[in-house]
């Protein structure tokens, strides 16, 4: 074997080991896992007693779905624009850390003839928004680090929740969202636009 081939194989092995090590390190400290034939296998945590899964969950029909948007920087405004044209939807609240972003979305709503939505902003704006009883769905389009806390707050306040990807930053947060969805019997949906291609299903 020539030197070039040996170095290529050694470099590939180093990358593979580094990748699996990084995967293991990205798991939260409380996540239990083990190695099995060169693969990281994550153990399913103990499920709360009596809690039912939400596979096939059907919520009561809502005549007009009252939607709130949290995160209006990149994907959020496009989502607001699309929802403005969906029958049976009422946008009732807009929230972003920067007030101007929410006001810009409000401007688009006005332009297409929709009634104004309430505006929330700042670090804790989403918490106030989630306390409202007149919101059915919270659409989360914040930066990645805030997807989980906003979705958690929405579920804890009895709202259906739709989250741009990634929905969480570690497996512990994923299980927290699953548990909240099961406990509250509210939908928690990951807004992935490519689910059934070969790459996703293999």
Task: Tell me the role of every PLM-derived stretch.
Residues 3, 11-14, 22-159, 175, ...:
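N-terminal glycine-/serine-/threonine-rich beta1-alpha1-beta2 phosphate-ribose binding loop
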Residues 73, 167-168:
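Short beta-to-alpha linker loops that shape the active-site pocket of alpha/beta-hydrolase fold enzymes
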Residues 141, 164, 189-191:
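A cross-family glycoside hydrolase active-site/sugar-binding cleft signature
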Residues 158-160, 164-166:
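Short helix/strand-capping hinge loops at secondary-structure junctions
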Residues 168-202:
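A contiguous active-site-proximal alpha/beta segment in oxidoreductase catalytic domains
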């Amino acid at each position: 074997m020539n030197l070039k081939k040996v170095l290529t194989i050694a470099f590939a092995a180093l990358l593979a080991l580094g990748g699996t090590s990084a995967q293991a390190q990205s798991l939260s400290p409380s996540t239990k896992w083990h190695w099995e034939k060169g693969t990281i296998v994550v153990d399913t945590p103990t499920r709360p007693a009596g809690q039912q899964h939400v596979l096939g969950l059907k919520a009561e029909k809502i005549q007009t779905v009252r939607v709130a948007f949290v995160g209006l920087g990149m994907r959020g405004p496009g989502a607001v624009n699309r929802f403005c044209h969906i029958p049976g939807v009422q946008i009732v609240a807009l929230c972003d850390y920067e007030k101007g972003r929410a006001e810009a979305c409000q401007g688009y709503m006005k332009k297409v003839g929709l009634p104004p939505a309430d505006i929330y902003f700042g670090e804790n704006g989403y918490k106030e928004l989630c306390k409202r009883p007149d919101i059915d769905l919270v659409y989360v389009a914040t930066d990645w680090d805030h997807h989980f806390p906003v979705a958690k707050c929405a579920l804890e306040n009895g709202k259906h929740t739709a989250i741009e990807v990634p929905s969480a930053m570690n497996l512990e947060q994923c299980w927290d969202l699953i548990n909240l969805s099961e406990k509250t019997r509210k939908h928690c949906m990951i807004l992935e636009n490519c689910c059934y291609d070969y790459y996703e299903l293999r």
